[in-house]
Every structure is written in C-alpha cells, then in structure tokens.
Amino acid sequence: MLLGLCALIFVGACVLGFVKIDPQTGKPSLSLSGAGIDVSLPDLGNVSLPDFGGLAIPSGAEGLQDAAQKAISGLSGWPYAVGQSGLTVKTLRAGKGEAVLVCADGYTMLLGGGSGMGAALTAQLLLSGVGHLNAVVAMGSDADSIGGLPLAMTLMQPEYLLYPSSQTKGTAYNRLMDTAQKSSKTQLMAAKPGISFMLGRAQVTIIGPAKTPHVDERNDGLSVRIDYGQTSVLVLGGIIASGERELITSKVNLDADALVCAQGGSEEATCQELVEAVSPRIALLTGKNPANAVRVRLMRVGSDVYCRADFGVMTLFSDGQTMTAKP
C-alpha cells in the first residue's frame, strides 16, 4: 500500500515536471519549479533553525534544493541505473508477478507487467530514465503477469505490443488489449515461437510456448531469448516444469549465460532437465519466496544465484563479450 502511494506521488511529480530523470544514469533530480508551473516560495533566509547537534542544515530554498539533490546523488549503487550502451536487463519490483526491463543501446522493451495497477511499475521505469518503450511483451494473460501494463503503456506509448494467444480472456487481458487498441501509436502482434526482431544490437527471439493449447494455461505464456554479441539471457516467464520440458523437446537453443527463472523460482518450475540444458552462469529468482530446492539445483551446475528477497531490483549487464550481475 505504502509503495503504491509513493509510486503515485512520484509518477505525478514526474508528469508535472518536479522530478527530472538523468538519461545517462537514470537518477532523479529534484526541481522546485515544475514545467509550466509557477511555484512561489517563501523567503527562508531569515528563518532561524534549531540546533541539531552540529548538523549543518542549509537555509533558503536553494540550500534545501541543493541538500535534497546531494542526498539523491549520494545514493550508492543506484539500483535503477541503465547504461546508454550495451545490454541492460533489470528485474523490477512487480508485486506477485514479474516485470523485466530490457535496454539495448538506448532501445527499450518491457517483458511482463506484474500485478497491481501499474503505479509502482511505471515509477520504476521513470527512475530508470525510461520515458518511452519501443516494445512491450505480455508474457502471460493473467492479472499477475500483465496487471501493470495498461498504465505503463498509456504513459510510455510503445510502438509494439506482442501478446500470447489466450484460451481465457479475463479482465486483465481485456483491459490490456483495450488500452493497446485505443492507442494510435501501438501495433499489436500475436507472438508465436520463432518470431525474432532486433532491439538495438540485441536479437530478441520468442522461443515458447513450444506448443498450444495446454491444460494448464500458464504454459501458454511466452518465453524469450535475448542474444547480445557473444552473450545471452533467457526470460522464461510464467511457465511451469512441463512447459520447460516442451522447450527442451523442441530443440530450441537454451544454452545461455543468464537465466531469469520461470515462476520466480518456485518449486513448480526450473526443473533439473532445464537447469542442465541452460547451465547458466547467473540465475535470477524474482519471486518473494523462491524454493530452496531450485537454488540448490542451480548452484550444483555452478550458477551464481541472486534472489529478489535478498537484493530487490537485480541487474544484468553485457558489453557483448561478458555478462555480469549487479544485485
């Protein structure tokens, strides 16, 4: 609740121009004069501040603004920083679901939207310096997978929306499609395995589902492979173990440097066969409570495992030669 309220305030501040985003670092900066808004500030120069035990507090509006800016710029290891070159893959806080921001040489794509109405998701995109999305991929059709996408799409105006075929078109799915259809800037594309496109110098390929339909609709969700230079990452979305085995049987290339595990790292996915097929050096578990058995399976093949529960927002970066993780 508190995160959502803060996100709404932040989104509003960005829209009104009180918060500026540095496109190079993604760090926010505070401006007390909004875009097109005259903000009259009282004269604080003669105000006597109480003694805070030697703590230097600047007086005047400019001093307060400088202090606020220094506090923001002093944040170490800013988790939302996105490079303007290379490949950045960032897992965002997305409630019960998953949202992955992909930036390649200045081009942007969002995989999934997580649960909720999208205020927190949109705030994180703005914190990452993203004001526009080139593509959005709806990884599933349920509310936990795409709930936050309509608001993000309304503000970010993506050029493409790739969506899975769905047997059951629920409220979240219908709201997403309605939002996309109302936008004159967004082209809808039914995603099928084998579809491939370039995002900057990154090649994005839809590798799953290997077949449809399924008794368990989670296996109808999309899985994505991203190749950048000599490096690669798999984002498997919301499929479960049976869907992973179908990917293996389909003979699609699953070998990758990094793996964003399906189902956030729950026991229902990341089966032993998949772990052996991918053999990732890096594995990200985005669920709130990933299964210990999944961690063990990954560590046994030599993976460095990072969990949302421990690190929050997690980032992969590639220069085309090496993939590294920055939790």
What are these regions (language model features)?
Residues G4-G45, L49-P327:
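Non-globular, low-confidence helical/coil segments that flank catalytic cores
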